[in-house]
Amino acid sequence: MSRENVELVKRLYDAWEKDGFGVVPALMDPDIEYVNPQYAVEPGPRRGYEGFAIAAEAVRAVYPTRRFEPLAFYDARDRVAVRVRVVARGVGSSVEVDAERGYVFDVRDGKVVRFAWFNEPDEALKAVGLEE
């Protein structure tokens, strides 16, 4: 099943590339949890499609121009860690942010049930028990 989970997460990135970062009901559980790390401006979880949509809108508001480029997918059974290149420009800024981040997707019954992000890709690997 874990290979299918990686493919599911890849389809989610394809949807985000096409339609923008946000809720994708076909690939996400209605009770999805979006988790900001403790060092985030607004730490903690957001729940459901509405919570995910609010968190995604906050990202779009700060970084109206952004691109997520998955660099590597790590299979961890019912979890998938992703090393991602984020290229973004903040509101009113001419400075481009170009950094690698780590994301973790928890999958159950063919849907993403939890999404968590980390400033450092190694944090995501550690979170799923795969230290690089």
Regions found by a protein language model. Name each.
Residues 1-132:
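C-terminal and inter-domain tail/linker signature
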